[in-house]
Amino acid sequence: MSYSFAEKKRIRKSFAKRASILPFPFLLATQIQSYTDFLQAEIAPGKRKNQGLQAAFNSVFPIESHSNNARLDFISYMLGSPVFDVKECQQRGLTYAAPLRARVRLTILDKEASKPTVKEVKEQEVYMGEIPLMTDTGSFVVNGTERVIVSQLHRSPGVFFEHDRGKTHSSGKLLFSARIIPYRGSWLDFEFDPKDYVYFRIDRRRKMPVTTLLKAMGYSPAQILADFFEFDHFILVDNKIFFNLIPERLRGELAGFDIVSEDGKVFVQKDKRITAKHVRDLQQANLTKIPVPEEFLLGKILAADLVDKETGEIIALANSEISETLLGRIRQTQSSEISTLFVNDLNYGPYISQTLRIDETTDQMSAQVAIYRMMRPGEPPTEEAVLALFNGLFYSPERYDLSVVGRMKFNRRVGREELTGSTTLSNDDIIDVIKILVELRNGRGEIDDIDHLGNRRVRSVGELAENQFRAGLARVEKAVKERLSQAESENLMPHDFINAKPVSSAIREFFGSSQLSQFMDQTNPLSEVTHKRRISALGPGGLTRERAGFEVRDVHPTHYGRVCPIETPEGPNIGLINSLALYARTNEYGFIETPYRMVRNGRVTEEVVYLSAIEESQYVIAQANANFDQNGVFTDEVVSCRHKNEFTLASRDQIEYVDIAPAQIVSVAASLIPFLEHDDANRALMGSNMQRQAVPCLRAEKPLVGTGIERVVAVHSGTAVRTIRGGVVDYVDASRIVIRVHDAEARAGEVGVDIYNLTKYTRSNQNTNINQRPIVRMGDVLSRDDVIADGASTDLGELALGQNMLIAFMPWNGLNFEDSILISERVVSDDRFTSIHIEELAAVSRDTKLGTEEITADIPNLSERQRARLDESGIVYIGAEVEAGDVLVGKVTPKSETQLTPEEKLLRAIFGEKASDVKDTSLHVPAGISGTVIDVQIFTREGVDRDKRSKQIIADELGRFKKDLADQMRIVEADAFQRAERLLTGKVAAGGPKKLAKNSTITRDYLENVEKHHWFDIRLVDENTSLQLEQIKDSLVQKRKLFDLAFEEKHRKLSQGDELPPGVQKMVKVYIAVKRRLQSGDKMAGRHGNKGVISKIVPIEDMPYMADGTPVDVVLNPLGVPSRMNIGQVLEVHLGWAAKELGKRVNEMLASQRNVSDIRDFLNKIYNNSGKQEDLTSLEDDEVLALARNLSSGVPFATPVFDGAHESEIKQMLKLAGLPESGQTTLYDGRTGEAFDRPVTVGYMHVLKLHHLVDDKMHARSTGPYSLVTQQPLGGKAQFGGQRFGEMEVWALEAYGASYTLQEMLTVKSDDVNGRTKVYESIVKGDHKIDAGMPESFNVLVKEIRSLGLDIDLEEH
């Protein structure tokens, strides 16, 4: 077993019983793959698939003019390179995007020739706007901020059958309906009403009889009846009527006459119910014709028009009911045969026949006109318009698109073998749907479950972007069509037709303000990954949270292995926003698939098959915890499994698939909760949601008890830095790592050096700190994909969201009542939960009417203390400690001293004189913020002079870039000279520097005495070697040129003006790092949904302590466990204690300098006792010592979800650590030194500090802004508002009879404007008198009443 660089340093002991045969898939694959397929940027134009941008262009082009004499064809598209990289876009507030250019061809046809010939062809590349590019981590940078496009779960196109569950009609009768949903186009609904008529609706408009639609499609009534009914045939011979008998059709009917054979045998007597036995008897007798009385025909419905053969006269139309009168006419015409519809009340209803009767249309045209009137009320129906509308509804590819998915789902549902076909509807499609609907009403078939994941599909970012791009192109198409008619006369080129604005605005709107384009949750690496794996049922074309019912939100059996049943928000969005399960992926149709191991001949193989929800239901699938031996043969006779979405038991030879892993059913966040199987689902939901809110601590600490997936999340999120190629660490400092790449991995022509610039103290979207730290040293040998630097919340390449705290479960003086948390002062003093938050503040210098605002240090009335922090440009220096109210950027705005006369205004305008008086509009530190200035960025518009500070920032940036280039050049040169030395040593020279003799052999000593760049002047006898030397020299010269060009490009980028909003001359951004220590009121939580607020920070000496004198860090209330049913936290605490103590044992061995073999033996006892076996023999002695040093703070354990440590294994570890197997110990009161009455559960728990910090919530105001109308103080911290004294608070004061306090609250402390001023004056004078007047809101009320026409006057008393 091979370990990666970081894994070797600290191996996590896993209790997993079953090794997963499938590695964890790349967690961001859904996003990245979807957008790659959309762009197809790396694929040659000729080989691109018809998807994404290619499909959007193909769907709109070619565009033809109205007269068909000019055509615009699309050939291919090309994506350019982005101007700025991701980091530069974030700093400058730009969108990380690439220019899109489409090559189009304009063809002008000569219509006047006998046959259309090509007159002129013009080809050109046309700019189509900018397309945002995805970053390596699956996000987008839009206007400088990172955003995520959330995938949408919507109802798949296709046909769906359902009923109203008896809710529509008071009788509870089930009303069936069918709906054909296209990807794009009109919805078509079919439905039954309570009277059993069948109606259709288009786009949920007024309903019409379904036969109207059938007639509009060209079907006659007789054809409609023939399609939907089976017929009964009657033969009329010599005034006798014979019935062609099909015995099966008579079952359940009441015999109206004796059923007799020709020889007189009575099979069924009159008025008897025909049973299955009667039917069998009739079939055995092979009776095909029976005589029936005339009355039997009464009430039957004619299947076809009844025509008098002699005269050709139509006696009765198809669908007419046979009455006595009609029967008489039939006798007279001497018809030999009559066909009627076979209907009954039980399972062959006359629904279409009834509907045909209420249909008022007579022929195809009248039916189409009726549909036109329903769709376009008020418009006159001309024949052309009627036909155009009807054909455009479902038959036109431009207007209607069922999509490949829709066609597949449609064909599968109506029972066709072929799963592909036209993406528009055909007449057969509509007929088939109505047939199935009628069959459902007749009691045959099943309705669809719309919450089944086989009926819901995922639209990922690529598909969503494609739809927006297509919508933009469709707008372009209209404009192009108009202009194409002028193509020939005005000699226009292709770029004259295409205006890219509609396309770029559609894309910009989608990425900037769509409901599915969300501001990325960047609190910690897990929240990033989870956000990108989120699946939302909301958004355009989806559900709304008001209309979504319980069923849509509920967990469905098909969610198994596809969508996490645990992770979803609490509140109004519950169940509508879900998370993709750990191993799930989407297939080509957008349906979620999950992997299974195939079972062949009763043996579990290692072959992995992905199944969608539709495919899965037909198989018998065992769970991952099924027991099987080494050969894959099940050991149990009966195995728990799933079949047809039900949990059941099956014999082992019936099993067809097995789950891939126990963690398959949950999402990333839920799979990070150890002992998840022991937690109640509600608490697990809170636990997975709260992990996303954990603030990165100053020093990340790996969880002692994890699940083994921590490394995957840290690496896949992009937070931890991985090597692109293997190599040796050449240089490392806090901000950069230089790696000399292995020769085997460096491709020809590539630079054999990789430089990783680390992110230092950068602000995330949530103001948390992103900081990367190297974990390698110079000389370390690395492989590809090794972790070389930790990011926020990662420790040695593992996710570390919180800190391991020593926990005691016990009450303590009521301070941990109701989930409150008691914390030791040591936790604060050791900076265990201290976090850094970075605030971004911006000052903007604008052009005003009176002149330009100036950023300067020369500010009126500024104290020396404040001015000392500013440099000569008026900008705060980096490293300054600032507090609320301090000046960060000095800025003055010109102000008009007096109101100018028009003449003065004119003179000012002519002579360009600026205002002489200025006011201070400097950027101050807002209330509640104090910290250290860590960075300043200055952006200047093109043409505006840069100040000294701005020039210095550019010089520093160029210096850093130059250092990178110098390192690259140093390694490239060293590599080149090394190759040259190997090439030259021992070769015969033809001459060279330092008087190298002809035909002498070149030695290493000679080369050392010659300057290296003169080696290339050596002339060699062997031409081949000379050529190789020349190639090395050329390659070196080429690299130098490339580096010079790169430096020039960087210099050009930094020196050019910045894009700023209109009217802005200069913008200064100041970044302040705020250190937040733990304090009372901060919210903390474990990973099991056990959350609480810190009630008190207790001195270390007062905390309960153990027998060895170790005080506990945190005291939790034991009553928080039983009612919440999250026992996982107790097991975590036990195992955490064992982990810590084992670490101490390892540390003691290191301290006493024990032999490496002893340490190996002890580590073997830990790692290879139970669970997953670790190969410690593959480690060298120094690697074992490095591992032991890293384990001294605690041996990390992994207890995978649903496959974790058992109670016996926890006890075993406690025993190995020399701890009581109960996990409890006697604690002593820190204040009295007395032992507590009974042993207390003590151990280590991974505790998180959540992003609900009391500093962000606490807020105080004395005076501040007031509302304009009511003159009452504003509300909320952001507005620096006051606390609302509401109705109930008024009642409280009234109840106490505190009339003066109440008057003060409602007047001078609120909206009595004059009273406020007077109170201020009286306080200044030292006289605390209150003179309450009229509240402003009362005046507002008076005005309101006056507006209603009631005059109110106030009288003075």
Curated annotation (Swiss-Prot):
A UniProt-annotated Pfam family: RNA_pol_Rpb2_3
Keywords, in A-Z order: DNA-directed RNA polymerase, Nucleotidyltransferase, Transcription, Transferase
Keyword Glycoprotein: no
Key word Magnesium present: no
Enzyme class: transferase
InterPro entries referenced in this protein's UniProt entry, alphabetically: DNA-dir_RNA_pol_bsu_ext_1_sf, DNA-dir_RNA_pol_bsu_external_1, DNA-dir_RNA_pol_su2, DNA-dir_RNAP_su2_dom, DNA-dir_RNAP_su2_hyb_sf, RNA_pol_bsu_bac, RNA_pol_bsu_CS, RNA_pol_bsu_protrusion
Catalytic activity: RNA(n) + a ribonucleoside 5'-triphosphate = RNA(n+1) + diphosphate
Any one GO CC term of the record: DNA-directed RNA polymerase complex
One Gene Ontology term of the molecular function aspect: ribonucleoside binding
Entries under NCBIfam families matching the protein: PRK00405.1 (NF001616), rpoB (TIGR02013)
UniProt function note: DNA-dependent RNA polymerase catalyzes the transcription of DNA into RNA using the four ribonucleoside triphosphates as substrates.
Family of the protein in this entry: Belongs to the RNA polymerase beta chain family.
Subunit note: The RNAP catalytic core consists of 2 alpha, 1 beta, 1 beta' and 1 omega subunit. When a sigma factor is associated with the core the holoenzyme is formed, which can initiate transcription.
Name of this protein: DNA-directed RNA polymerase subunit beta
Organism from which the protein derives: Nitrosomonas europaea (strain ATCC 19718 / CIP 103999 / KCTC 2705 / NBRC 14298)
Gene field: rpoB
